[in-house]
């Protein structure tokens, strides 16, 4: 069995620059085709699953946030308006009857 030398053997190892992708591709050739295709299929299905879960999560968050905004915003606005009216009535009462009336009403409420 004779060894055949080519030009690649004359290049020193310190001058060979290969990327990580090239190195992984070269290492992948040492595994059987069945194993490589199984790993490739598993990775593809995993990526598909993660994309699906991400898309479902985005849609769910959008539906929940817009629904809660539509449902609770009128309540929040009405409560704020009611609190403002109560504050205005208390201020008017204080102006008309003096500070003691406002304190007395606060104790009874």
Curated annotation (Swiss-Prot):
Predominant localisation class: mitochondrion
Q: Where are the transmembrane segments?
A: 61-77
- Which UniProt keyword terms apply here? Membrane, Mitochondrion, Mitochondrion outer membrane, Protein transport, Receptor, Translocation, Transmembrane, Transmembrane helix, Transport
What Pfam families does the entry give? Tom22
The membrane topology of this protein is: Single-pass membrane protein
User: What organism is this sequence from?
Assistant: Caenorhabditis elegans
Family assignment from sequence similarity: Belongs to the Tom22 family.
Query: By what name is this protein known?
Result: Mitochondrial import receptor subunit TOM22 homolog
């Amino acid at each position: 069995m004779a060894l055949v030398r080519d030009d690649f053997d004359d290049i020193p190892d310190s001058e060979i620059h290969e990327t990580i992708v090239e190195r992984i591709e070269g290492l992948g050739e040492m595994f059987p085709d069945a194993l490589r295709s199984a790993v490739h299929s598993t990775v593809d299905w995993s990526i598909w699953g993660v994309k699906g879960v991400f898309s479902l999560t985005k849609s769910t968050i959008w539906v929940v946030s817009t629904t809660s905004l539509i449902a609770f915003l009128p309540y929040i606005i009405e409560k704020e308006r009611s609190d403002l009216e109560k504050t205005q009535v208390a201020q008017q009462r204080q102006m008309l009857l003096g500070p003691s009336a406002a304190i007395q009403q606060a104790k009874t409420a």
